[in-house]
Amino acid sequence: MTVRRFSRLIIAVTGGLVLTVALAAPASARTPVDPSTLNPPPPPEFNPVCFVDGSHITCDIAFSDPDVVDAPSGIVCGGTELLDSHTRSVVGKRTYDADGNLLQRHFRESWDGTFRNPDTGLVALWTQDDTDIHNLAVPGDFATGTETQSGPITRVWLPDGGTILTDAGHLVIDVATDEIVQASAHHPLVFGDPAALATLCAALD
């Protein structure tokens, strides 16, 4: 499992960050844009609503992924891999230049899930609510630029309410290499701190 995949599963922004969205003009004043003409186009399942926004094109998006049930988590406890189940919903926007090339993705994800030890049947709950900003280095080239995730991060706890782990801080990821190029604060989950993961394993043993 890459650092990026694990961070996308775990990293959360639980503070009061709010997407920076320009005040919308009345719907009647918007000039609609066909999402399929953009580079790259937002997937249809994102329910994009695209329109001319000054010198740019903006697409509002909102969607939920299919539920994930008992997927491998990448966290191994004494030879047993914990299973992850979760839901994910997303709201946000994409900004394109006047030629229809993607410049920025700005979105907020809400996750709720569990880690389950299949041997013991014990479960830990986790939640996250992260805000991400992906600024493309090359307009239209999705695999370039940096993605920033910041703010207070994930909480993992037991059903009786006892907190097992928290993860908080600021991360900058190089999208092309999938590497974290800047990190601040406390990230035991993102970086797989053995002591932190041992605490989770012990709670589910």
Regions found by a protein language model. Give the residues of each.
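Beta-strand-enriched cores of mature, soluble protein domains
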Residues: 30-205
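Secretory targeting and sorting signals
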Residues: 1-30
